[in-house]
């Protein structure tokens, strides 16, 4: 089989849905309590915080609804190309297609610490670095290494490592 398709999970995750529910519940509570408050300044501040929380929950709901960041990577060895398709905000799509001549290497970035980062990038001849892994929980190092070497062999590219 010469075509390999890999699904990428976008913003349609349980953690985002839980945060959206928490924000809309807490924001509505703040807003209603602010409206019922007998102290004008305290009520106005609570209404403001409630409005901000509800606005953020609407933004998060739309991000989940449109599944921003979701899509697929398609690796084709027969045509020697890679296709990257993602959903963007406002239901816009991002479609990138690179031939073997435009690909330079695969880059692995590993950053430990408070905000760990473990990602695989496609480096192009123009200098662009396109992420191939999904955003979210960083994958284990063994899985990242296996996936990167498999992709490098599949696409016949060199593998460049970087530890930050």
From Swiss-Prot:
- Gene Ontology BP terms: photosynthesis
What are the TM regions of this chain, as residue ranges?
Answer: 14-34, 45-65
Keywords recorded for this protein, A-Z: Chloroplast, Membrane, Photosynthesis, Plastid, Thylakoid, Transmembrane, Transmembrane helix
Q: Name one GO cellular component term.
A: chloroplast thylakoid membrane
Where would you say this protein principally sits, based on its record? Answer: plastid
> Can the keyword Zinc be found in this entry's annotation?
no
- Keyword Transferase listed? The answer is no
What is the protein name given in its UniProt record? Answer: Photosystem I assembly protein Ycf4
Provide the species name.
Cyanidioschyzon merolae (strain NIES-3377 / 10D) (Unicellular red alga)
Q: Which gene encodes it?
A: ycf4
């Amino acid at each position: 089989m010469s075509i390999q398709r890999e699904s990428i999970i976008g913003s349609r995750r349980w953690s985002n849905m839980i945060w959206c529910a928490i924000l809309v519940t807490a924001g509505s509570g703040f807003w209603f309590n602010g409206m019922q408050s007998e102290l004008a300044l305290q009520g106005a501040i609570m209404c403001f915080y409630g409005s901000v929380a509800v606005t953020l929950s609407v933004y998060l709901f739309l991000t989940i609804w449109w599944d921003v960041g979701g899509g697929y990577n398609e690796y084709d060895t027969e045509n020697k190309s890679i296709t990257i398709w993602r959903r963007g905000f406002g239901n816009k799509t991002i479609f990138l297609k690179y031939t073997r001549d435009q690909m330079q290497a695969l880059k692995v970035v590993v950053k430990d610490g408070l905000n760990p980062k473990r990602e695989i990038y496609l480096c192009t001849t123009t200098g662009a670095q396109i992420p191939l892994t999904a955003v979210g929980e960083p994958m284990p190092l063994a899985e990242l290494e296996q996936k990167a070497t498999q992709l490098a062999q599949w696409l016949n590219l060199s593998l460049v490592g970087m530890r930050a």
